């Protein structure tokens, strides 16, 4: 007997489905792969009988497994199952949407958010400073960039900005267009109060002792102040 690769795939799927069915009958909750295999196998067998339409198979496909017969989270992971099956009049694709009724439990990786506003950077004192862009190209500053060390062509009171960052949501930024003047709010950095990198003006703990040296570094590198 010679089998084509497609026929071998169907046999493997049938074997996996039969194994899943055996486990289900023994009361074992099925995982993601087992659930897909069982639904696919049952649809192939029902189609092989030759007395059901595609619409009927789509409906029956939703009745093969219940949420309490699979592992937690599996029901919501299986959004659809597609099976290419043989009918008396040819091969057709049967698509079953949401084949396992969800049980209302949490989805793996799901975010559950409170139905209320979230205060950003709560309990942190914020200051406002005026910034003027003296360059000829746009400059974008990220939320956690040490504002004291931003682009040398941004003019503002750098002494006030020492040890501070933008008072905006993490991962967002503020854009400065050439010639633009705007006020921004700054808050203190958290954590261990040690700043490394950026434009190499600090590379030290944020304190009064280091501030004067950092200001001197900025002046030496021609950062507008």
Curated annotation (Swiss-Prot):
Stored InterPro entries: Urease_beta-like (IPR002019), Urease_betasu_sf (IPR036461), Urease_gamma-beta_su (IPR008223), Urease_gamma/gamma-beta_su (IPR002026), Urease_gamma_sf (IPR036463), Urease_subunit (IPR050069)
Family matches, as Pfam families: Urease_beta (PF00699), Urease_gamma (PF00547)
GO CC terms, sorted: urease complex
Keyword Transmembrane on entry: no
Recorded superkingdom: Bacteria
GO biological process terms on file: cellular response to iron ion; urea catabolic process
Gene3D superfamilies reported for this sequence: Urease, beta subunit (2.10.150.10), Urease, gamma-like subunit (3.30.280.10)
Chain intervals for the UniProt region annotation (Urease gamma): 1-102
Residues passing through the membrane, by range: none
Compartment annotation: Cytoplasm
CDD domains linked: Urease_beta (cd00407), Urease_gamma (cd00390)
Keyword list, A-Z: Cytoplasm, Hydrolase
Record field: catalytic activity: urea + 2 H2O + H(+) = hydrogencarbonate + 2 NH4(+)
Entry's EC annotation: 3.5.1.5
Molecular-function annotations in GO: nickel cation binding; urease activity
Class of this enzyme: hydrolase
Subunit note: Heterohexamer of 3 UreA (alpha) and 3 UreB (beta) subunits.
HAMAP family, per the entry: Urease_beta, Urease_beta_gamma
Sequence similarity: In the N-terminal section; belongs to the urease gamma subunit family.
Name the record gives this protein: Urease subunit alpha
Native source species: Helicobacter hepaticus (strain ATCC 51449 / 3B1)
Source lineage: Bacteria, Pseudomonadati, Campylobacterota, Epsilonproteobacteria, Campylobacterales
Gene assigned in the entry: ureA
């Amino acid at each position: 007997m010679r089998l084509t690769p497609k026929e071998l795939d169907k046999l493997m799927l049938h074997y996996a489905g039969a194994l899943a069915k055996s486990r289900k009958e023994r009361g074992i909750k099925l995982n993601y792969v087992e659930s897909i295999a069982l639904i696919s196998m049952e649809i192939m067998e029902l189609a092989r009988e030759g007395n059901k339409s595609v619409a009927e198979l789509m409906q029956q496909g939703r009745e093969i497994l219940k949420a309490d017969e699979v592992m937690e989270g599996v029901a919501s992971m299986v959004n659809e199952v597609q099976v290419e099956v043989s009918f008396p009049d040819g091969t057709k694709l049967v698509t079953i949407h949401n084949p396992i009724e969800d049980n209302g439990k949490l989805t793996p990786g799901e975010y559950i958010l409170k139905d209320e506003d979230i205060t950003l950077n709560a309990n942190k004192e914020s200051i406002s400073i005026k910034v003027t862009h003296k360059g000829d190209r746009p400059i974008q500053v990220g939320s956690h960039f040490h504002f004291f060390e931003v682009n040398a062509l941004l003019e503002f009171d750098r002494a006030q900005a020492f040890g501070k960052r933008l008072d905006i949501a993490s991962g967002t930024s503020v854009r400065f267009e050439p010639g633009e003047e705007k006020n921004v709010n700054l808050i203190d950095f958290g954590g261990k109060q040690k700043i490394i990198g950026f434009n190499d003006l600090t590379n030290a703990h944020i304190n009064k002792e280091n501030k004067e040296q950092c200001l001197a570094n900025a002046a030496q590198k021609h950062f507008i102040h």
